[in-house]
Structure formats: C-alpha cells, structure tokens
Amino acid sequence: NGHGYYSAKRFFGKMFDRATLHGIPPIRFTGATLSEGSWHYQSIWNVGGGKNLYDVDTREWGSTTSQGKDLRDVTYANYFPVGMGGNFPINANSTVEQYEHIQAISVGLGTTYSLYLNQKDVESCPQKEAIFKVIRTWENARAANAFPRDKKKLLTKPEKNWRLLDGENKDTWILNELKDGKKVKSYILNRA
C-alpha cells in the first residue's frame, strides 16, 4: 500500500492480536530479508537453502557460493536465529549419522533448519525411526540449554562426528565424539 515497513508491522501486529483473541498459538514466520522492525514479527531469518549454505554430504559451507561462510558469522552471539533452509529432507538415502551431524552443526552455531517431510520419501527411509529419535534427543537437550559454550564450539567443526544419547537420569545427556564410528571422548551434559 506504499507505506513500507510501517504497514507491514501494523499488519502483523493486528494479525497476532487477532490470533490471540481466537486462541491460536503463536505464529512462526520466516523471511529472507532483515528489514527495519522485522524482528517484531519474524521468528527466524531464512537466508536460503541448498548447497549455498551447508552441504551435509561434503561437510562444507557454501559449496556453490559464499552464503554459508556468511551464515556462520551471522549466527554467533546473535539474538535473531538464522535458518539453514530446507536442505535436509528425509528420504531413502538419509542416515542417522547425517542427522547427528546436522543437529550438531545446528546446535553449535545456534541455527535452525526446515525439515521437509514427504510421506512417501520418509516411508522409504529404512532409518526413519532412528532419525526422528536423534532429532528429538538433540532438540530436548537444546531446549534444556544443556550445551555449554565450549561444547558448542566443538560441535561447529564439520570434520567431527557426534552421537548424543539420553543420560541415565532425567535432564542429562551423553555427548560422544566418534572417530571411525568408535567413541573417543564423552561429555556429560546437564539441564542448565
């Protein structure tokens, strides 16, 4: 309507107020552009997807452009979470190891990602149940703020392999560093 950012903020403000009035839980928004006031209504900053950001197969950032390298700089100590796009759909070729790695990178950098789910593709994945368990375990630990800064820094290293397990007690986890599929180090994590 020609009123720029002001009208966008008014629109989203009214939409959120109306949603609250109708008992609708908070609405999550993503957008590709940070603009004046967008933090009022955007939940995450979606800076793209595909191999422009993170390539889980080659474990490199920005394998086709420099966007991935930029993403790491943006996410560190930023209160506005950045998304790695919808790069990691579950399909017949997906493995538990890939999702342990994706979650480690995501937690280490403080990013989110969009998980594309297509029933036919998910059902074709022999490791689907284990993959969902991996995602749930990592997200439970993340929600509990169980990763201290020194562990987060370790998780950002693409050459490392990790496995996160539920601990013996509630609100505890065991973070194992793996080399050639074997545990080389273990760290006990606790709810903060």
Positions of the model-derived regions?
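Active-site groove signature of glycoside hydrolases
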Residues: 1-3
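Active-site-proximal substrate-binding groove within the catalytic cores of carbohydrate-active enzymes
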Residues: 5-192
